[in-house]
Amino acid sequence: MRVISQDGTIDVPYDYFSLSMSSGKYKDVEVAYIYCYNLSSPNGTKLAEYSTEAKAIKAMEMLREQYARIEIIKALVSGTCKHMEESLEPEEFKNILKKYINMEVFRFPQDDEIEVVE
């Protein structure tokens, strides 16, 4: 799965990077960041910025949930792709394939796109 930064400028493979969150106050305003790390960026690269720690945690949960769905779909589809191709209309198969490909990419949502129940 590919992980895209909030601003769309960074694209990393999820399986080869570790992600972490940090939060605190800057000029009396709470902020939270999500960073990715690997050998080529040991100090971390900022992927997203949120106005609260709760929103950053929610964004990380969204990422993990999407990754889990993809893994389940991969397990279900393995060995059945040929059967699906034969039993579905070409347009149906194309739409399913497009949805799967879109699931393979996670872009961190903007701050105002995350709702947190407190």
Whereabouts are the PLM-identified features?
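Eukaryotic intrinsically disordered, low-complexity regulatory linkers and tails enriched in Ser/Thr/Pro
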Residues: 1-118
